[in-house]
């Protein structure tokens, strides 16, 4: 016969793990709680377990006897010594077996960590919990309690009322007065801090667990007790080793594993939080504090169990069945007097499942325990489900639907539903204004405070001290119509050949140069003259001090010349007119001067205030005179700046260099820009790694009016943006992110608003054909120029839609975007790599590469022309007169006709004209000459003509043949 481990455990009131451990200690190998154990092995285990319990079992049936009787039974030598040393009266009604039957108790009696709810009543037990005489296993005989852990006579309400014990059974750090207030024990019942080896530290405890008169050093004299509080028969580790206690709280008999090591158990073995029934059942629980029958997990693994052996989450009654356990006295907070206990039920009294005052005591316990926070293993009382939604929120001027829902702790769907009820169609990411948000929140019972906080996106301008201002070089912008010689003029000034390097011989982005004339520096900005570069010219005019307007003497004032004049006037910039190409025979400077007067520029020779200098860039004529005029105007303007401050300026141009990363050409307007400075331009920022001047030389600093190329930005800034030097990179990042978020919010606001009018417009737009384009260019300014030029090509029927524009080479990402959106890619001064080309061919994406902006515009124009619906034009081919009418069976009426002019073809459309009125228009059904079908009949011949679906042909009718010709439309 055999018995399973879990059955044996139930029989012995042990955990399966404890039984398995004990079986292994006697040489029986078992794998789990379902393993079978032979009867002889089970008997060996039973015998071994029952040996150390002789004394306890002898007195166990006498639980709850009156105080004097139990004292007589259990008083022993150890108890006597203690009584003598303490001089205290032994407390009654605690028999030895009642406190903690040790034989069959696999689990330690009390964890010592941070047990908030002590097990022992503090009221009548000032000196010691357990007599040590005949109770080798008892918890702690306390001066007046020789008979057990808890006096049962007067303590019906729990094992240890917690009068002045806020922190646990033996809270070891926060218990000022100890488990049992001892008068001279300020440090707690068993402080655990300095006690590595036992429940009661013996070395550093000046006051001891229970000051005993002649026992200054510990709870119990440790002479014969090297390892713990109470050496037990076969307990090698002591009563309660605390630090490295492999044996548990009070290992019993042959319990090598211990009940609960106290090292990592802050909350104690028996959390007292919500156990109204007391720590140990007092009535008929002869087998120990916790019946272990159904506990397949053994002793209670103590590893990472901070909450004690039994989680108290859902167990308001504690780990142990509380059926016949009178309610525990509620714990008290520090300073609260102990709650007086009613008399305990005596032997022979009828058991009640719970004390009749249980409900009242439970409420009292809740009230007393309310302020205590360190109760991790206490199950929280069931709380009412409350509405946690805030009643008051603070919102900005505008916010998204999702943000509003989050602030009100509501679902986004509820907010969207409210908006729909108000007639507002909104998505989760759509912004709504504060007024709408206030209405929505009001309907949901939330009050709203609107707080307008704009993120810092603008850096304050610092006023310069006039005493610190110094003269600076003038910034001169060269403007004019395309091919009028602006760059050639600059070449003549700089004695370089920039024009030769420009694609198509025209300037396609701003060039910034600095030259020195007579010891004075002048900064030149060369702007494009082509109509596509309006934005660039406007930027050039904004940052300049003087504008040189180049006009070809042989060409006169042209559209871009007029535009340049307007830009300069708008920026309030003085204009110097350079009449170029005077070396040509057909040049006529006077005509140019005359044309300029039409736009408000009257030259000095004619009594105006506009300086005009005739020059020849190729022949280098009058170049010095022009520069002298520039210096003269600059001197009159008294251009000054403070070089000793943080730099500010303008981004002239920006590009993405394959090796250097984002590169920006900047013009410093104030202060000095140094390598290592942190600059912020729009939503891009970074620390300057290197600076290069217009001649390609590396420089470490750049003063006012100096153009330099900077490296180190995190992204390509937009041309025309103002840059500032900031002290802190973190601050720069915050401002850049705020600007980027602001821009994104604006884009979302513009694209997500839906109304009936918008819907109608979009339906109409469905009839408009779109040419999607992706623009990639070498510099930011070229993208702008190309985009503006292409948008100007749009008509009411065909529209250019630039879906993406970026600086740098064409990448595979661009190809994928083009394939998804059915777009063509326009590359301006950039080339794709081999992989990108292969991907484009695979995806069937049309990639067009250009170096001259004219070509790009013309090609896009041609593509758009092909998308236009063609026009149809009617072309009359010939006329025939009906001379005779024939009625042919099964065919209908046929008109015998004579071709008057032109020709009649078989596939022509015809119209029948009678007396000058068109009476029918339709298809030609048959065309015959004699009895044969004819393809066409020319002038002067007769033929038979049958008209489809028309038989009312009469003599004298004129049949006119015509076709519709497709005519291509032009933009």
UniProtKB/Swiss-Prot annotation:
Residues annotated as binding GTP: 480-487, 526-530, 580-583
Stretches for region G4: 580-583
Major location category of this protein: cytoplasm
Single annotated GO MF: GTPase activity
Compartment(s) where it occurs, according to its Swiss-Prot or TrEMBL record: Cytoplasm
Residue ranges of the region described as G1: 480-487
GO CC, one annotated term: cytosol
Start-end of Basic and acidic residues biased regions: 53-63, 342-370
PANTHER family recorded: TR-TYPE G DOMAIN-CONTAINING PROTEIN (PTHR43381:SF5), TRANSLATION INITIATION FACTOR IF-2-RELATED (PTHR43381)
Family (UniProt): Belongs to the TRAFAC class translation factor GTPase superfamily. Classic translation factor GTPase family. IF-2 subfamily.
Name listed for the protein in its UniProt record: Translation initiation factor IF-2
Source organism of this protein record: Desulfitobacterium hafniense (strain Y51)
Gene expressing this chain: infB
């Amino acid at each position: 016969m055999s018995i399973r481990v879990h059955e044996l455990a139930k029989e012995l009131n042990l955990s399966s793990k404890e039984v398995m451990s004990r079986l292994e200690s006697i040489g029986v190998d078992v794998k789990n709680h379902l393993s079978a154990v032979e009867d002889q092995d089970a008997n060996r285990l039973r015998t071994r377990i029952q040996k150390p319990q002789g004394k306890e079992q002898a007195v166990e049936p006498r639980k709850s006897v009156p105080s004097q009787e139990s004292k007589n039974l259990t008083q022993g030598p150890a108890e006597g010594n203690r009584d003598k040393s303490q001089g205290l009266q032994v407390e009654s009604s605690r028999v030895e077996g009642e406190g903690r039957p040790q034989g069959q108790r696999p689990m330690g009696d009390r964890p010592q960590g941070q047990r908030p709810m002590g097990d022992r009543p503090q009221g009548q037990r000032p000196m010691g919990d357990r007599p040590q005489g005949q109770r080798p296993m008892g918890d702690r005989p306390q001066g007046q309690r020789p008979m057990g852990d808890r006096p049962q006579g007067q303590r019906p309400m729990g094992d240890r009322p917690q009068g002045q014990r806020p922190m646990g059974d033996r809270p070891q750090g926060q218990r000022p007065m100890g488990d049992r207030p001892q008068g001279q024990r300020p440090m707690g019942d068993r402080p655990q801090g300095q006690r590595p080896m036992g429940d009661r530290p013996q070395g550093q405890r000046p006051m001891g667990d229970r000051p005993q008169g002649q026992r200054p050093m510990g709870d119990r004299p440790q002479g014969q007790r090297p390892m713990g509080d109470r050496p037990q028969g076969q307990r090698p580790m002591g009563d309660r080793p605390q630090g490295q206690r492999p044996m548990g709280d009070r290992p019993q008999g042959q319990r090598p594993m211990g009940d609960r090591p106290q090292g990592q158990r802050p909350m104690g073995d028996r959390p007292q939080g919500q156990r109204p029934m007391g720590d140990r059942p007092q009535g008929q629980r002869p087998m120990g504090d916790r019946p272990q029958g159904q506990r397949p997990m053994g002793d209670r693994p103590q590893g990472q169990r901070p909450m004690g052996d039994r989680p108290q989450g859902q167990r308001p009654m504690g780990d142990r069945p509380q059926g016949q356990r009178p309610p525990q006295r509620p714990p008290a907070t520090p300073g609260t007097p102990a709650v007086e206990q009613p008399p305990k039920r005596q032997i022979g009294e009828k058991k009640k499942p719970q004390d009749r005052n249980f409900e009242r005591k439970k409420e009292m316990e809740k009230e007393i325990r309310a302020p205590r926070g360190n109760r991790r293993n206490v199950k929280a009382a069931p709380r009412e489900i409350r509405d946690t939604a805030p009643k008051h929120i603070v919102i900005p001027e505008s916010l998204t639907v999702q943000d509003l829902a989050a602030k009100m702790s509501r679902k986004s769907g509820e907010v969207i539903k409210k908006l729909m009820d108000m007639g507002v169609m909104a998505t989760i990411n759509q912004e709504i204004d504060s007024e709408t948000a206030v209405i929505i929140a009001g309907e949901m019972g939330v009050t709203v405070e609107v707080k307008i906080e704009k993120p810092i996106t603008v850096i304050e301008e610092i006023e310069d001290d006039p005493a610190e201002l110094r003269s600076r070089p003038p910034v001169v912008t060269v403007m004019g119509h395309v091919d009028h010689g602006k760059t050639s003029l600059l070449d003549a000034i700089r004695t370089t050949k920039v024009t030769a390097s420009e694609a198509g011989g025209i300037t396609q982005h701003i060039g910034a140069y600095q030259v020195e004339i007579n010891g004075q520096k002048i900064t030149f900005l060369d702007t494009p003259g082509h109509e596509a570069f309006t934005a660039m010219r406007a930027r050039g005019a904004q940052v300049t001090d003087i504008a040189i307007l180049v006009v070809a003497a042989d060409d006169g004032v042209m559209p871009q010349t007029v535009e340049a004049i307007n830009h300069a006037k708008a920026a309030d910039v003085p204009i110097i007119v350079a009449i170029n190409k005077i070396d040509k025979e057909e040049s006529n400077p006077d005509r140019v001067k005359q044309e300029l007067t039409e736009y408000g520029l009257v030259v000095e020779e004619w009594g105006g205030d506009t300086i005009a200098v005739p020059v020849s860039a190729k022949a280098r004529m009058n170049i010095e005179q022009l520069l002298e005029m520039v210096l003269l105007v600059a001197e009159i303007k008294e251009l000054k700046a403070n070089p000793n401050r943080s730099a500010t300026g303008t981004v002239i141009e920006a590009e993405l260099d394959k090796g250097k990363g984002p590169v920006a050409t900047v013009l410093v307007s104030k202060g000095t820009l140094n390598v290592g400075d942190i600059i912020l331009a729009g939503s891009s920022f970074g620390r300057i790694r290197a600076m290069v001047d217009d001649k390609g030389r590396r420089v470490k600093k750049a003063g006012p009016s100096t153009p330099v190329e900077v490296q180190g930005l995190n992204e390509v800034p937009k041309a025309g943006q103002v840059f500032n030097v900031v002290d802190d990179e973190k601050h720069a990042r915050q401002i850049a992110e705020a600007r980027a978020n602001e821009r994104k919010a604006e884009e979302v606001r513009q694209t997500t608003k839906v109304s009936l009018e918008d819907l109608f417009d979009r339906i109409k737009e469905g009839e408009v054909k779109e040419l999607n384009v992706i623009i990639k260019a070498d510099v930011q300014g070229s993208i702008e120029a190309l985009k503006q030029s292409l948008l100007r090509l749009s008509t009411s029927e065909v529209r250019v839609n630039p879906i993406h524009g970026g600086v740098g080479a064409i990448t595979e990402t661009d190809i994928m975007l083009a394939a998804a959106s059915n777009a063509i890619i326009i590359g301006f001064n950039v080339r794709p790599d081999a992989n990108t080309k292969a991907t484009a061919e695979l995806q069937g994406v049309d990639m067009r590469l250009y170096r001259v902006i004219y070509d790009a515009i013309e090609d896009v124009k041609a593509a758009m022309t092909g998308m236009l619906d063609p026009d149809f034009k009617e072309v009359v081919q010939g006329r025939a007169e009906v001379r005779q009418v024939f009625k042919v069976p099964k065919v209908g009426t046929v008109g015998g006709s004579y071709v008057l002019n032109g020709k009649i073809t078989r596939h022509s459309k015809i119209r029948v004209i009678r007396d000058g009125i068109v009476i029918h228009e339709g298809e030609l059904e048959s065309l015959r000459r004699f009895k044969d079908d004819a393809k066409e009949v020319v002038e002067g011949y007769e033929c038979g003509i049958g008209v489809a679906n028309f038989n009312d042909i009469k003599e004298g009718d004129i049949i006119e043949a015509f076709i519709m010709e497709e005519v291509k439309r032009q933009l």
